[in-house]
């Protein structure tokens, strides 16, 4: 299986029913506190506002947030850690009418209420201390 480059950036437009699927593996053991970060940007540049920020400090915590007009908002933190040390993971972020639902290895693990409409997303970036084997955006068929 070939690896995708990290950081990985792709243009995307999201709406209710869209799902972003990411498959990868932490590059270091959890004792070294590797990170995974997924950002849904409003423009095709890293400095743009972030509709949804999802950051995992493997083995410790998950932080979710948004950045509006250049300022971070109130972060939501969870100690729920469904990721396994040294194991491949599949992360799916689904756009629901009022929130994002985050699944890890097929299990509902986190939710984050919309602060900025998902239709504002123009780019998804996946980065930090992971090897990345899959990135896909699927859309609800109408």
From Swiss-Prot:
For the modification N-acetylserine, which residues carry it? Answer: 2
What else is noted? Forms hexagonal bipyramidal crystals, known as Charcot-Leyden crystals, in tissues and secretions from sites of eosinophil-associated inflammation and some myeloid leukemias.
| Subunit-structure text | Interacts with CEL.
A GO molecular function assigned to this protein is:
identical protein binding
What is the protein name for this chain?
Galectin-10
| A single cellular component GO annotation | collagen-containing extracellular matrix
- Provide the function of this protein: Regulates immune responses through the recognition of cell-surface glycans. Essential for the anergy and suppressive function of CD25-positive regulatory T-cells (Treg).
Q: Where is this site: Not glycosylated?
A: 136
Instruction: Report the residue ranges that make up the Galectin domain in this protein.
Output: 6-138
The record's account of tissue expression is: Expressed abundantly in the bone marrow. Expressed exclusively by eosinophils and basophils. Not detected in monocytes and neutrophils. Expressed in CD25-positive regulatory T-cells (Treg) (at protein level). Found in intestinal tissue from patients with Celiac disease, expression is directly related to the histological grade of mucosal damage and to the number of eosinophils found in the duodenal lesion (at protein level). Found in sputum of patients with eosinophilic inflammatory diseases such as asthma (at protein level).
Lineage top rank: taxon:
Eukaryota
* One Pfam family, short name: Gal-bind_lectin
> Could you tell me the Gene Ontology terms of the biological process aspect for this record?
regulation of activated T cell proliferation; regulation of T cell anergy; regulation of T cell cytokine production; T cell apoptotic process
Q: Which UniProt keywords apply?
A: Acetylation, Cytoplasm, Lectin
Location(s) in or outside the cell: Cytoplasm, Cytosol; Cytoplasmic granule
């Amino acid at each position: 299986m070939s690896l995708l480059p990290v950081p990985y950036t792709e243009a995307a437009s999201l709406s209710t029913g869209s799902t972003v699927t990411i498959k990868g593996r932490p590059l270091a053991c959890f004792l070294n506190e590797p990170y995974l970060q997924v950002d849904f940007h409003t423009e095709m540049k890293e400095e743009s506002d972030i509709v949804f920020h999802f950051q995992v400090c493997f083995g410790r915590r998950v932080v979710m947030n948004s950045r509006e007009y250049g300022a971070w908002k109130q972060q939501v933190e969870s100690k729920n850690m469904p990721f396994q040390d040294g194991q491949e993971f599949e992360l799916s972020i689904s756009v629901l009418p009022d929130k994002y639902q985050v699944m890890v290895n097929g299990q509902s693990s986190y939710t984050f209420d919309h602060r900025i409409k998902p239709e504002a997303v123009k780019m998804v970036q996946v980065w930090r201390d992971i090897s990345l084997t899959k990135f896909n955006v699927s859309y609800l068929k109408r």
